[in-house]
Swiss-Prot record:
KW Metal-binding (keyword) present: no
PANTHER family: 30S RIBOSOMAL PROTEIN S12 FAMILY MEMBER
Protein name: Small ribosomal subunit protein uS12cz/uS12cy
NCBIfam families named among the record's database cross-references: rpsL_bact
Keyword hit for Ribonucleoprotein: yes
HAMAP family, per database record: Ribosomal_uS12_B
Localization terms from the record: Plastid, Chloroplast
Functional description taken from the UniProt entry: With S4 and S5 plays an important role in translational accuracy. Located at the interface of the 30S and 50S subunits.
Annotated Pfam families: Ribosom_S12_S23
GO CC, alphabetical: chloroplast; plastid; ribosome; small ribosomal subunit
InterPro entries reported in the protein's UniProt record: NA-bd_OB-fold, Ribosomal_uS12, Ribosomal_uS12_bac
Annotated keywords: Chloroplast, Plastid, Ribonucleoprotein, Ribosomal protein, RNA-binding, rRNA-binding
């Protein structure tokens, strides 16, 4: 235990909480380049082939980001916009790719929840 004199000389540092999306460096989104696009299996009890991409961000981090929606056009060297938000059944996936921005096209034939998949309002 430190003495009073030691505490005066060097005050105690508060314990800082770890950020949930450190790779974004406090920004709402970050641009990045796909290094690899592949599928992974979710944790039990779920079963699927979830589409993910390994993305090298402008902040220097290389992260794994989820590709939401049905079907995508992403491949290696695609430029994407990444936001925070984990995928509960994929361990280590703490980011999502924004559909309809940069090289990631919007989901086709989407009628509901369009804003989450970059789909414009359909013409009447």
């Amino acid at each position: 235990m430190p003495t009073v004199k030691q505490l005066i000389r060097n005050a105690r540092q508060p314990i800082r909480n770890a950020r949930k999306s450190a790779a974004l460096k406090g920004c709402p989104q970050r641009r990045g380049t796909c290094a690899r696009v592949y599928t992974i299996n979710p944790k039990k009890p779920n079963s699927a082939l979830r589409k993910v991409a390994r993305v090298r961000l402008t902040s220097g981090f290389e992260i794994t980001a989820y590709i939401p929606g049905i079907g995508h056009n992403l491949q290696e060297h695609s430029v994407v916009l990444v936001r925070g938000g984990r995928v509960k059944d994929l361990p280590g996936v703490r980011y999502r790719i924004i559909r309809g921005a940069l090289d990631a096209v919007a989901v086709k034939n989407r009628q509901q929840g369009r804003s989450k998949y970059g789909v414009k309002k359909p013409k009447k």
